[in-house]
Each structure stands twice: as C-alpha cells, then as structure tokens.
Amino acid sequence: MMRRIAAAAALILLLPALAAAQDLVSLCERARHPAVGAWSEFKWVGGRNDGATIRMSIVGKERREGADYLWMEIVMRDFPMGSGRQQAEAPRRMISKMLVPGFGAGAGSPRAAIIKLGDLPAMEMPVGQSRMGAQGAPNLEACQNAKVVGWESVTVPAGTFRAIHIVGANGRGDSWVAPNLPFALVKEVGNDEGQSRQMVLIAHGMGARSLITERPQPFDPRLFVEMMSGRRPAPKP
C-alpha cells in the first residue's frame, strides 16, 4: 500500500512537468512559422557581446516549387567583428535577409540570402555562406531535445511573461519560452568563454518591414571581404 501511495505521489509531482513538456511541443511547433510582420528584439547582457542587439522579423513570404517560404530578416547591431583596428572600422550594423522554410532548424538551409553591412550596398550571398548572418540569433534547437523544468514567471525589459523554463540537452544554458511571442524566446542564460551572459527580450510586435529597400548587387568575393573588414569599397569606374 505504501508503495502505491508513493507512486501516486510521485506521479502527482510529475504532472506539472509532463504538462509543460506537452505545452513546449505545441509552442515550438507554432513558433516555427511566425506571422508576416512579426518581430522581436533581444539584447545581450554580459559576455563578449555585451550591449549588442538582435532584431528578428518576418518581412514577407514567397512560394517556390510548390512550397511556402518566409523572408526572415535579422538586424545585428554592435556585435564585435574582427579584432583591433579591423574591429574598430567594421560596420556596427549588419542586416541578413534569408528565404527559409521556417524559423528553427530550417533557417539553416535558406533558398536565398541577402546581406547589407552598415550603409554599404546590399549584396546577394551564396546560400552555403548565409548562416553567418544568423550567428548569435536565437533558435529553436532547444525545443527538440530540451529538459523541461516547468512553467515560471520571468521578467525582462519587454515585460513579465509566464514561460516554460527549459535546460539544454547538454545541461548547459537555460531558456524561457512563451506562447504568443513571434519567436517564443523570452530569456536565455549561458556561459560565453567563461563569462556569464544573458540574452533578453526587450521589445516585440507586428508591422515589420524589410530595411533592405534597394536591389542587391550580385555576390563579389573581393568586395565582400573589403566590406567585412570595414574598408569602404572603391567606386566602380
């Protein structure tokens, strides 16, 4: 009898975590396809990217070869690029625009990509190199293999949210994800080269439009290297 009581008590204690795990699966599935116009902005606190911001948005959709794709745009500001003089001269803003099947794992295999550094002209990118624009951006990998802690209240600059607390599959890094947010993520805590760092939601909303308004020029490897190093390309004759 005591064993049955203990088993029942253990099950009762597990029910909230089991329910949160089911909620997480549903939440992550919805977050893979944000609505056109949805946006979220995050800020890094601590670590080598301290003070940097990332704004993620869905600025359009397109149908190719019978499949629907989203234009996802990532605006990165004040991220360190290079080192020394190169870092000082590098553009402080980078815009990456990618045509992807959805947010999350699919975003790593874009069908098309455009990049714009500072106020320099936008440039098409080979799709095999387009992941560079998404480095440091939040993703949904944790949704697939995370350990669920449970529902918690978490406060960030964007407000207070009821969110699911999850821990990465490798035991490193905690994240809080919430329904009804464009990209689910509310807060992420981890370690960056021995330094504690956080990425927190500072704002979100609808009505996003692409910041790349000009027609991008074809990819030019030499020009791209100059742009990344902070050197302004010489005008074409």
Language model: regions and residue ranges:
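Phosphate/oxyanion-binding loops and surfaces in catalytic or ligand/nucleic-acid-binding neighborhoods
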Residues: 101
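Bacterial N-terminal signal peptides that target proteins for export
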Residues: 1-9
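Acidic, serine/threonine-rich low-complexity disordered tracts
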Residues: 22-98, 113-237
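Sec/Tat signal peptide C-region and signal peptidase I cleavage site
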Residues: 17-21
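Bacterial N-terminal signal peptides
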Residues: 8-16
